[in-house]
């Protein structure tokens, strides 16, 4: 398989951008790595945070962002046995980990202190060819469309893990805050596939239409609701509130409201990462109602296998729009304005 020496990529040359669409060298895989010809890459809010330096974690610069890359294996290191040339593969947020620490040994490899993060500490998938450690790359079954699979590699795995962390059971209700975004659209479907009832919380008629098309039972529009807490509680069958709340919002206020409409003994799972935000909860209310508040990061390798299996069986469809790689700056603008329903997937130039 012929591999060029140069490729097109979107590169942030300094924190805060701007992005530069230019040619850069094609990397060569190390002994335990695969080189993937990226066909499609999803665009996540994390990619924008990385470029802007919003988080207190040092970010590589210059940086090729992206961590939802789906494509074909075109080269591999001599130690790689998991993949063959021509296999479909996905490169995720967790590009690699040490494999030796306590967290890696107990399958909490996302918590590894030496984890390598695609599009953050190592170059990611907004380029035609990207590297990934073979043990952390995902196998995408043959016949599964790569454009539709791309958002599952981060958004899908992340919300699937969050639902598992919430401990919510079939027949119970989950409130998904930020339901109309890329993560939320997938969270609704995973919840439904797991037999969980959904109250979708977001703003705007376009997001309402999308959520209703995904089968949500109730949509609460925070831009129109006079009493969001009452509306979420009223949407649950017994009026006692949601058994779990999945927080995917990118602003702070929803993180402060969640304890008001989660039911007693309920669980609040924080996944969204608004910059400089804090979680605050009244202590007495949290204690006497036995509310659990926890964070959920990305899934481990097994979570990735399970999340992709839901997709391969046709239980999950990622609502997405396709755009060329050169349009990434426009997509970031829409993202900053909160005007994206579902997910954007970038198509790489041939």
Swiss-Prot record:
<protein>
    <recommendedName>
        <fullName>Alcohol dehydrogenase 1</fullName>
        <ecNumber>1.1.1.1</ecNumber>
    </recommendedName>
</protein>
<feature type="binding site">
    <location>
        <begin position="178"/>
        <end position="182"/>
    </location>
    <ligand>
        <name>NAD(+)</name>
    </ligand>
</feature>
<keyword id="KW-0479">Metal-binding</keyword>
<feature type="binding site">
    <location>
        <position position="46"/>
    </location>
    <ligand>
        <name>NAD(+)</name>
    </ligand>
</feature>
<dbReference type="GO" id="GO:0004022">
    <property type="term" value="F:alcohol dehydrogenase (NAD+) activity"/>
</dbReference>
<dbReference type="GO" id="GO:0008270">
    <property type="term" value="F:zinc ion binding"/>
</dbReference>
<feature type="binding site">
    <location>
        <position position="44"/>
    </location>
    <ligand>
        <name>Zn(2+) 1</name>
    </ligand>
</feature>
<keyword id="KW-0520">NAD</keyword>
<comment type="subunit">
    <text>Homotetramer.</text>
</comment>
<feature type="binding site">
    <location>
        <position position="202"/>
    </location>
    <ligand>
        <name>NAD(+)</name>
    </ligand>
</feature>
<keyword id="KW-0560">Oxidoreductase</keyword>
<feature type="binding site">
    <location>
        <position position="98"/>
    </location>
    <ligand>
        <name>Zn(2+) 2</name>
    </ligand>
</feature>
<dbReference type="InterPro" id="IPR002328">
    <property type="entry name" value="ADH_Zn_CS"/>
</dbReference>
<feature type="binding site">
    <location>
        <position position="67"/>
    </location>
    <ligand>
        <name>an alcohol</name>
    </ligand>
</feature>
<feature type="binding site">
    <location>
        <position position="46"/>
    </location>
    <ligand>
        <name>an alcohol</name>
    </ligand>
</feature>
<feature type="binding site">
    <location>
        <position position="343"/>
    </location>
    <ligand>
        <name>NAD(+)</name>
    </ligand>
</feature>
<dbReference type="GO" id="GO:0005737">
    <property type="term" value="C:cytoplasm"/>
</dbReference>
<dbReference type="GO" id="GO:0006068">
    <property type="term" value="P:ethanol catabolic process"/>
</dbReference>
<feature type="binding site">
    <location>
        <position position="67"/>
    </location>
    <ligand>
        <name>Zn(2+) 1</name>
    </ligand>
</feature>
<dbReference type="InterPro" id="IPR001763">
    <property type="entry name" value="Rhodanese-like_dom"/>
</dbReference>
<dbReference type="InterPro" id="IPR013149">
    <property type="entry name" value="ADH-like_C"/>
</dbReference>
<dbReference type="GO" id="GO:0006567">
    <property type="term" value="P:threonine catabolic process"/>
</dbReference>
<dbReference type="InterPro" id="IPR011032">
    <property type="entry name" value="GroES-like_sf"/>
</dbReference>
<feature type="binding site">
    <location>
        <position position="101"/>
    </location>
    <ligand>
        <name>Zn(2+) 2</name>
    </ligand>
</feature>
<feature type="binding site">
    <location>
        <position position="104"/>
    </location>
    <ligand>
        <name>Zn(2+) 2</name>
    </ligand>
</feature>
<keyword id="KW-0862">Zinc</keyword>
<feature type="binding site">
    <location>
        <position position="154"/>
    </location>
    <ligand>
        <name>Zn(2+) 1</name>
    </ligand>
</feature>
<keyword id="KW-0964">Secreted</keyword>
<dbReference type="Pfam" id="PF08240">
    <property type="entry name" value="ADH_N"/>
</dbReference>
<dbReference type="GO" id="GO:0046187">
    <property type="term" value="P:acetaldehyde catabolic process"/>
</dbReference>
<feature type="binding site">
    <location>
        <position position="112"/>
    </location>
    <ligand>
        <name>Zn(2+) 2</name>
    </ligand>
</feature>
<dbReference type="InterPro" id="IPR020843">
    <property type="entry name" value="PKS_ER"/>
</dbReference>
<dbReference type="Pfam" id="PF00107">
    <property type="entry name" value="ADH_zinc_N"/>
</dbReference>
<comment type="similarity">
    <text>Belongs to the zinc-containing alcohol dehydrogenase family.</text>
</comment>
<feature type="binding site">
    <location>
        <begin position="271"/>
        <end position="273"/>
    </location>
    <ligand>
        <name>NAD(+)</name>
    </ligand>
</feature>
<dbReference type="GO" id="GO:0097308">
    <property type="term" value="P:cellular response to farnesol"/>
</dbReference>
<dbReference type="InterPro" id="IPR036291">
    <property type="entry name" value="NAD(P)-bd_dom_sf"/>
</dbReference>
<keyword id="KW-0963">Cytoplasm</keyword>
<dbReference type="GO" id="GO:0005576">
    <property type="term" value="C:extracellular region"/>
</dbReference>
<feature type="binding site">
    <location>
        <position position="207"/>
    </location>
    <ligand>
        <name>NAD(+)</name>
    </ligand>
</feature>
<feature type="binding site">
    <location>
        <position position="46"/>
    </location>
    <ligand>
        <name>Zn(2+) 1</name>
    </ligand>
</feature>
<dbReference type="InterPro" id="IPR013154">
    <property type="entry name" value="ADH-like_N"/>
</dbReference>
